Amino acid sequence: NKRFDNIKIEKKVVNEDPPLPFNLVKLQSYCSSHFGYNPADVMDITQSLRETHKAITYNRSDCQYLSEEHFKEAPKTLAQVVQNIKFKPSELDPTIHSKCFNDKNITAHFAIIPTNNKVDLNKLTEREKNVYLAVCKYYMAQFLPKAVKEKTKMTIELGGEYTLVAYSTVVLKKG
């Protein structure tokens, strides 16, 4: 018959940045968990998207950042992506300067993003389409407002012997 000695609840509202655009490893991981593709398949798919369809930038990048020059080109790139995928989030704003735009974090290459080229989704295989849309989604996320979340931590002490901790996150505004 233990009783709760102390219950402490901490709440805070946080703004959350969008995920950075993909590098090859992150894209392979995403495609594995979302579509069941193995890393070699993702490499082949991205190679086709890059060379055959001219749909994405250099696909073997180890970097998740973009240059300030990419930020300047964003209105044109976003307009083409929206036309290609026939979807535009209502809050898409090319003036939002995400933390991914940072010349200091660029390595030999930059993040994998869509190109300014016209892409006909009907000419892509299902796998190519899935990967292309994932790349587009992560790129477009850079131009959406930050997500707003309420994070709660509840700590319960039980009879001086045990401490239980529970966490909760509630999305107040999607980013």
Regions found by a protein language model. Give the residues of each.
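Core catalytic DNA strand-manipulation module of type IA topoisomerases
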Residues: N1-G175
